[in-house]
């Protein structure tokens, strides 16, 4: 596939690197000479210094032969206008725009909704020519809400139906400690699947001989209703979240507060596929008076405090350390980590930290942070989900992007269609986690005798960038604009 990316910042360069690793033809465009030079030194792709919103410049970069365009500049309007411009001349190209401004994002979402209502779900053209619109803050807030739903005991990967993958730390007291997977399978009450293991900084797909050690992070596939039991197996406990303190009055914090307001819950929880909130008590703390005022105007019923969250007087007066959960969601990612670690030392039960990317996960773990929300990884995963073809529904990276968990529809051209899993001799380095054949009403964890039919949906884990595995399941990518 040929993909043109406009914007050679950190996210644009990270996306280009991931796409090049899959063998795609990537063209990265930016009008900043220094960013172009830096990207050109680091990436094995075409990097061009040009005005990305100029159609002539894009055509010189090979726009007419492109499959997709991704706009990641720092200017939301440029990102949106560029997509509209390209759509007018090349409607077949899939266009993805990052829009950071929440108001811009919501207005576009609303226009798209009205177009669908007026013309039906099969409307010929997307609003503003944008096939897929993403807002990093909305994606991050959604991840925070998912973590809150299950007590912030670990991170959770949303996959098929009633299932999820819980990424949990194995405690010293865990029933899984120092046991092989084949022995874990015989434990009373164990009806789950360990999909991957992160041990000593390395992520592996386990086999029956793999030994689970205290301190390991394990990805456990289970029904959502069984999460409290899964937590017990790893030595953790399911803890209700009632009182929440949020550090930072930035966009992600505002969206998190909005999701907890009774008048907004129907919208937010239908948008993100969550259950309704449990009536949590929220307090937001920020040192910036203007941000506090803005948030207070938006949510008059919320408790907004101006101050330093590490100030002993504030901690004592507001009894901050007795909260159930502290969410560090400011725009300063390094301070989020340090604040989370400090609050954990002061006795806060659970902490969530918003970070720049998954490179900080290992450090966060050593600092005692329960859950990290890596902003750039979330954005990359969302974009990659859209660039794998219409049969690929979602992509979640794990283990510093070593592996990916992919949800897809089995194409009639797929090599696995109509075959039993035990007859698939080319699954090395991958694992089928869930399957749902066309006649099935629910997802199931398959076994060797399970046949995967054409039109089925499947969730599998494979090495990142292994396009052969993706095509084996989903067939050759076909983009749909």
Regions found by a protein language model. Give the residues of each.
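Cytosolic regulatory regions of ion transport systems
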Residues: 1-481
